[in-house]
Amino acid sequence: MAYQLYRNTTLGNSLQESLDELIQSQQITPQLALQVLLQFDKAINSALAQRVRNRVNFRGSLNTYRFCDNVWTFVLNDVEFREVTELIKVDKVKIVACDGKNTGSNTTE
């Protein structure tokens, strides 16, 4: 089973809204919509792991951290993100980090 973190992104929310509309108009079943979301979870996790190669450095003050169920959560204050030509400052950032190598599924494709 893939992590479902990216369902709360702009892309994930748009997909869920579109699927809800299709369900309401009875063009697809709720079971098919669930299958689409599960495939989205697998695809987005795979794409981010394999295709994204950009590097961003950041620095901030650690407010809180937590490790639960193999998931790290960090809350940072006064954070600076640096890319090659850009600097972005934000007051607060929450980072959720999961093991991206294997989420325990034994699927073969």
Curated annotation (Swiss-Prot):
TFIIA is a component of the transcription machinery of RNA polymerase II and plays an important role in transcriptional activation. TFIIA in a complex with TBP mediates transcriptional activity. GO terms for molecular function: protein heterodimerization activity; protein homodimerization activity; RNA polymerase II general transcription initiation factor activity; RNA polymerase II general transcription initiation factor binding; RNA polymerase II-specific DNA-binding transcription factor binding; TBP-class protein binding. It comes from Rattus norvegicus. It is found in: Nucleus. GO terms for cellular component: nucleus; transcription factor TFIIA complex; transcription factor TFIID complex. This is Transcription initiation factor IIA subunit 2. It holds the Pfam family TFIIA_gamma_C. Belongs to the TFIIA subunit 2 family. GO terms for biological process: positive regulation of transcription by RNA polymerase II; positive regulation of transcription initiation by RNA polymerase II; RNA polymerase II preinitiation complex assembly; transcription by RNA polymerase II; transcription initiation at RNA polymerase II promoter.
